[in-house]
UniProtKB/Swiss-Prot annotation:
It comes from Neisseria meningitidis serogroup C / serotype 2a (strain ATCC 700532 / DSM 15464 / FAM18). It catalyses: N-acetyl-L-glutamate + ATP = N-acetyl-L-glutamyl 5-phosphate + ADP. This is Acetylglutamate kinase. Keywords: Amino-acid biosynthesis, Arginine biosynthesis, ATP-binding, Cytoplasm, Kinase, Nucleotide-binding, Transferase. The lineage of its organism: Bacteria, Pseudomonadati, Pseudomonadota, Betaproteobacteria, Neisseriales. It is found in: Cytoplasm.
Amino acid sequence: MESENIISAADKARILAEALPYIRRFSGSVAVIKYGGNAMTEPALKEGFARDVVLLKLVGIHPVIVHGGGPQINAMLEKVGKKGEFVQGMRVTDKEAMDIVEMVLGGHVNKEIVSMINTYGGHAVGVSGRDDHFIKAKKLLIDTPEQNGVDIGQVGTVESIDTGLVKGLIERGYIPVVAPVGVGEKGEAFNINADLVAGKLAEELNAEKLLMMTNIAGVMDKMGNLLTKLTPKRIDELIADGTLYGGMLPKIASAVEAAVNGVKATHIIDGRLPNALLLEIFTDAGIGSMILGGGEDA
């Protein structure tokens, strides 16, 4: 594989020189990273992600991690003999399932990410949206072809985010790692799509960047070519002609909404590539798709 080729000393020097203006430009800014897909499950990619996050912090960027955990939740539900059920791609989450979701996301997955970042020299702290009730949620009702407003249990959408807790951690030099669990008006837990939480958090933090790690190269056209720079108008065209559909739509919607609402740029990148974060942020070409809030496509 190309990623396994040995990089010469000259190439390393060139890469560092190319990165320097980006380091200067983004130092002091916030980058919200949605962490999911293969990058969360393959040991080498998990270690590489942790190292990259620590490096971002070392060069003055403030990373904030929002993670998923679908495969880990499925594995635990299977272990306890509870079958997963989905409506329109959303997990049906009754009280028993929510207890398991919260245990897996806020316990195992969150703490594993925190531990790995800290192992490589970072100072990460894990939080859930229920901590300080900083992510307020409301029940999400799903429309299906047969019925509108289907109740799928303790699945929520973001009602509001109080960034005080996260900003306080950043100001003290920590790397916040956020489990996407929100709290309802009665104190009940809600499972929230991690892409949605990442997008809303990036907006509220006035982040320079929102980076969504996926198992695809980025946004592709009908011919399978990577579209490296997009605007909301172009995204609408790709949805209208059927190029974008299915499970990609919620991710795209969160990315576009963040870009429109003040995040300087949102990026959809291939988390299966080693050093994906660094390649997207610190190289001229990047590796994924960048969505800008306005202007013309490049």
